[in-house]
Amino acid sequence: MKPEPQSEAELMERAHDIAGLSFAELADEAGMTVPENLKRDKGWVGQLLEWHLGAPAGSKPQQDFSKLGIELKSIPIGYNGRPLETTFVCVAPLTGVQGLTWETSHVRNKLSRVLWVPVEGEREIPLAERRVGTPLIWSPDKEEEQILRNDWEELMEMIVFGKFDQISARHGEALHLRPKAANAKALTEAYSSNGKPMKTLPRGFYLRTQFTEQILLKHYINVQSE
């Protein structure tokens, strides 16, 4: 793995250096094997980018570049330039949630400064031939942060009151909550609506594609107008 970048400028320079390169080229330099597909290797693209950008944190609660306060997110893009899937932010806490605030939440910490790296994501393009796009660095503006905060507070309130069965895909404008488990047997501790301990599927916070699409649009419109 490349050494950890010491500044945001150095990180961005590295991200720009790999823009336009294929996964095969990047994997070759990193000594990694390109899998046939991502069904069993969902985190492979992220690991490849982490190697080239020098991200030391892995999937711990802190940001990928904790010294710089920056989170790395790859974002698969379709032919139309739109995100193809939601973006995982972090695992949702289901116990010990009393007194949690937006200001100290993992979601806010992870999304305070994000390096977005678009990658070709159309399934008909062989994985080895997919290329990395132009990176962008982003922090939520006041409006975006308010939307995220409102969503987080609404969803966390439902968790506090044990309303897991009532949380659906329609809750949350930018952020939504859904089960995150490789199989249905991977249960975790939680509390039911009557306060009794129970087992349920782990949940994860995800950004909706409409929200990430707006981030990309705003950025590239601003770049073109400069």
From Swiss-Prot:
InterPro entries: DNA_mismatch_repair_MutH, DNA_rep_MutH/RE_typeII_Sau3AI, DNA_rep_MutH/T2_RE_sf, Restrct_endonuc-II-like
One function term, GO molecular function aspect: DNA binding
Main location: cytoplasm
Highest taxon in the source lineage: Bacteria
UniProt cross-references to SUPFAM superfamilies, sorted A to Z: Restriction endonuclease-like
SMART domains: MutH
Keyword Nuclease: yes
Keywords (A to Z) from UniProt: Cytoplasm, DNA damage, DNA repair, Endonuclease, Hydrolase, Nuclease
Compartments reported by the entry: Cytoplasm
Keyword Transcription regulation tagged: no
GO biological process: DNA modification; mismatch repair
Family the entry assigns: Belongs to the MutH family.
Function: Sequence-specific endonuclease that cleaves unmethylated GATC sequences. It is involved in DNA mismatch repair.
Record-given protein name: DNA mismatch repair protein MutH
Protein's organism: Vibrio parahaemolyticus serotype O3:K6 (strain RIMD 2210633)
